[in-house]
Amino acid sequence: MSNYRVEKYTKENRLAWDTFISGAKNATFLFARDFMEYHSDRFTDYSLLVYKDDLLYAVLPANIVGDKLYSHKGLTYGSLVLSKSAKLLYTFEAFKALLAFLDAKAISSLELRNIPTFYNTMPSDELSYFLFKANATLIKRDALMVIDTSTKIKFQKNRREGINKAKRNGLTIAVEHNFEGFWNEILIPNLQKKHGVAPVHSLEE
């Protein structure tokens, strides 16, 4: 029977982490350590590595707030990241080992934001199934849309009319390298009005 071990990420794991992410079936550049550590001053990292028979089998990008673990509040999404050779039964055991680790560390809850499936390089619905089996609570669901650029999309008539109207009224589109006007007059007021938040990044960033 396989042995599973969970460890908290340290800087000594950086190369192993990034190498694993580059070959995973459900990961993007957001999970690379350079990107994750960009906001290291705002989040307490508590990323986890899961080993199967001493080989890295899965990783969980995560941060901790009190006794609650999130995957990951500094990223658009998080997930249990798996290698391309991952098998359902082994992944189930790895996930159980991860939950047991959190319980042993007195972590009261785990909140996950699954990576959208269109980013996966291979089918990878294991985590959704495990969350169902664990009777997890769904607290939010986002609507996502993707454009398949290999398929021609019909142009709606009202869109064409909008373009023609813009041309008649002298609307022009130009490349602009000064973002200050957009930042202060459009982005900040709209984020505040619609969502009650400020931009995550500063204009300088």
Task: Tell where the protein language model's regions lie, with residue ranges.
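Acyl-donor binding region in acyl/amide transferases
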Residues: D67-N135
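A conserved beta-strand-loop-helix scaffold within acyl/acetyltransferase catalytic domains
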Residues: N3-D53, Y57-K68, N114-D142, V146-E205
